[in-house]
Amino acid sequence: MPTTTRSSIPEHVAIIMDGNGRWAKQRGLPRVMGHRRGVEAVRETVRAAGDCGISYLTLFAFSSENWRRPESEVSDLMGLLKAFIRRDLAELHRENVRVRIIGDRQGLKTDIRSLLEEAEQMTAGNTKLTLVIAFNYGSRDEITRATASIARDVAEGRLSADAITPEMISSRLDTSGMPDPDLIIRTSGEERLSNFLLWQAAYSEFLFVPEYWPDFDRQRFFSAIEQYATRDRRFGALAEQVAVAGA
């Protein structure tokens, strides 16, 4: 467990799970083996997040750009998602974990969409941890869909353009009702957001770790939380102002 105080635990942690393919390549294995080992890292991280009192854990599972990958790899990823939900949903429900899905569901195959909806519906009343799965997700697409929704309301007279605020835009995003991420972790040593939670990351702390996702374990997660606790979050203010506000 992290050695930080409860007040230093982030409410919302988001993770870009990167490096499955490179993990497999290093070991002379097919890429799908990296993805399979990555599922084990997901299970371990979800348990760790629940154990240390995090309220929201968002995992970037499949981006809207991932459809460009070889058809065989996409098929493997879809199969792993279905297997994860079928195998783990009952346990997540028993552990009081709520599942939410963000991303564009239009165009998904019926069986995938039905499984995602089943996971949300079964766990809707759970309160310990909200596990947010970003699937067929791209932040630019999310923002485009949100602003198009607002534009339609303005065009049809339901909304004044003068009434548009950052809070309104946030309410139209897939993450509506969720706090912005306090901490965004990316594995594999890459240092970029890759079209993930661009709007929501305005004041997030970032941690880029060298481990490939299949090697990211419980202790590495706790270490990330401890590193977060050392950060000085100012939200655009001076350090002195933050200190006074927290006094």
UniProtKB/Swiss-Prot annotation:
The keyword Acetylation does not apply. It is an enzyme of class 2 (transferase). It holds the Pfam family Prenyltransf. Keywords: Magnesium, Metal-binding, Transferase. Substrate binds at residues 19-23, 31, 35, 63-65, 67, 69, 186, 192-194. GO terms for molecular function: ditrans,polycis-undecaprenyl-diphosphate synthase [(2E,6E)-farnesyl-diphosphate specific] activity; magnesium ion binding. The active site is at residues 18, 66. CDD domains: Cis_IPPS. NCBIfam families: PRK14830.1, PRK14834.1, uppS. This is Isoprenyl transferase. It comes from Agrobacterium fabrum (strain C58 / ATCC 33970). The lineage of its organism: Bacteria, Pseudomonadati, Pseudomonadota, Alphaproteobacteria, Hyphomicrobiales. The gene is uppS.
